[in-house]
C-alpha cells in the first residue's frame, strides 16, 4: 500500500476523532447549561415572593370574592383573596396560597359569617378562636404586615328570598364585640363596618343588599368609603 495513502487515512481518522471529541464536549456543555437554567427557573411553592411595592390583600369569603376591588380602588395595589363559601377554618388550612404567597404589606380580613350560619352553641367562641389564630399566623410569618380585621356585616332576614339562614345580628354583634376587644390589645386594627350598614332596627339596610346577606353595588360604595383611608395611610 502506498505510504501516502496510509498517511492520508491516518490524518482522516484523526480528523474524525477530533470532530467526535469536540461534538461530545459541546453536548456536555449544552446539557449542563440547560440543566442549570432549569434549576434556576424552578419555583418553590413555599418560597416567599417578595413584592417590591405595597400589596394590599383582601382576605375573606364571598363578600370579598364578589368585591370588584380594581373598580373601587383604582391605581392601588389591591389583591382579592376571597373565596365564596369560605369559613375561618378554610383560610387557616390554606395560609400559603391565600396569604403568604402575596407577601402583603396590609391585610384586610373579613371572615366569619359562614361560620355563624351554624346553630352550634359555641360557634361564636370557635369562630373567634380561629380569627385569633389567623391573625397570629400572619403576624408570625409576615411580621411587617399591618392587619385590619373588619366586623362581620349585618344581615336582614326580612328581605324576600334571603340567604340569611341561621345567622342572626345578635350572634354577629356578640362575635364582633370579641374581635373588637381582641384588636384593642394591639394585635390588629379593628374596623367597625357593622354600624355603617345597619338600619334603625339594626338590620342590614335593604338598599345595600339583594338577598339580606351579600352586598350590592351601593353597599360596596359604603364599604369602600370607609376602607379607603386605611389603604391610603
Predicted segments with their positions:
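N-terminal secretory targeting modules
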Residues: 1-59, 69, 232
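Conserved SGNH/GDSL esterase-like catalytic core that processes O-acyl groups on lipids
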Residues: 38-133, 170
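Charged, glycine-enriched surface loops/patches
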Residues: 126-150, 168-188
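Catalytic His-Asp segment of secreted/periplasmic serine-dependent ester chemistry enzymes
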Residues: 154-233
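Feature marks short, surface-exposed loop/turn motifs that line or immediately flank catalytic pockets
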Residues: 87, 115-117, 153-156, 197
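Extracellular glycan-modifying ectodomains
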Residues: 2, 9, 18, 79, ...
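Alpha/beta-hydrolase-fold catalytic nucleophile elbow
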Residues: 110, 150-151
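Sec-exported extracytoplasmic/periplasmic mature domains
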Residues: 96, 100, 112, 136-143, ...
Amino acid at each position: 500500500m502506498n505510504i501516502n495513502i496510509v498517511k492520508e487515512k491516518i490524518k482522516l481518522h484523526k480528523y474524525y476523532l477530533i470532530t467526535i471529541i469536540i461534538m461530545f464536549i459541546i453536548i456536555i456543555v449544552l446539557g449542563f447549561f440547560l440543566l442549570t437554567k432549569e434549576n434556576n427557573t424552578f419555583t418553590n411553592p413555599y418560597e416567599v415572593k417578595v413584592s417590591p411595592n405595597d400589596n394590599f390583600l383582601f382576605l375573606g369569603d364571598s363578600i370579598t370574592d364578589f368585591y370588584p376591588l380594581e373598580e373601587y380602588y383604582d391605581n392601588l395595589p389591591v389583591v382579592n383573596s376571597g373565596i365564596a363559601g369560605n369559613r375561618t377554618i378554610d383560610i387557616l388550612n390554606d395560609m400559603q396560597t391565600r396569604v403568604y404567597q402575596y407577601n402583603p404589606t396590609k391585610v384586610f380580613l373579613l371572615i366569619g359569617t359562614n361560620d355563624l350560619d351554624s346553630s352550634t352553641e359555641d360557634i361564636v367562641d370557635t369562630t373567634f378562636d380561629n380569627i385569633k389564630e389567623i391573625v397570629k399566623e400572619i403576624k408570625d410569618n409576615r411580621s411587617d404586615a399591618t392587619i385590619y380585621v373588619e366586623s362581620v356585616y349585618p344581615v336582614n332576614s326580612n328581605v324576600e328570598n334571603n340567604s340569611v339562614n341561621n345567622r342572626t345580628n345578635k350572634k354577629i354583634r356578640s362575635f364582633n364585640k370579641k374581635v373588637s376587644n381582641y384588636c384593642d390589645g394591639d394585635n390588629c386594627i379593628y374596623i367597625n363596618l357593622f354600624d355603617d350598614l345597619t338600619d334603625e332596627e339594626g338590620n342590614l339596610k335593604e338598599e345595600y343588599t339583594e338577598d339580606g346577606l351579600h352586598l350590592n353595588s351601593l353597599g360596596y360604595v359604603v364599604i369602600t368609603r370607609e376602607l379607603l383611608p386605611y389603604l391610603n395611610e
